[in-house]
Amino acid sequence: MRTGNAN
């Protein structure tokens, strides 16, 4: 699983 953000 990958977590994070994309701006």
UniProtKB/Swiss-Prot annotation:
Domain of life: Bacteria
Biological processes, Gene Ontology terms: defense response to bacterium
PTM sites of type Aspartic acid 1-[(3-aminopropyl)(5'-adenosyl)phosphono]amide: N7
Lineage: Bacteria, Pseudomonadati, Pseudomonadota, Gammaproteobacteria, Enterobacterales
Protein's name according to its UniProt entry: Microcin C7
Chain's role: Antibacterial peptide, active against enterobacteria including species of Klebsiella, Salmonella, Shigella, Yersinia and Proteus, and strains of E.coli. Inhibits protein translation by blocking aspartyl-tRNA synthetase function and inhibiting production of aminoacetylated tRNA-Asp.
Modification after translation: The peptide moiety allows entry into the bacterial cell, where it undergoes proteolytic cleavage to release the aspartyl adenylate analog, which is responsible for aspartyl-tRNA synthetase inhibition. Can be processed by the non-specific oligopeptidases PepA, PepB and PepN.
Transmembrane segments: none
UniProtKB keywords: Antibiotic, Antimicrobial, Formylation, Phosphoprotein, Plasmid
Species name: Escherichia coli
Sequence positions bearing N-formylmethionine: M1
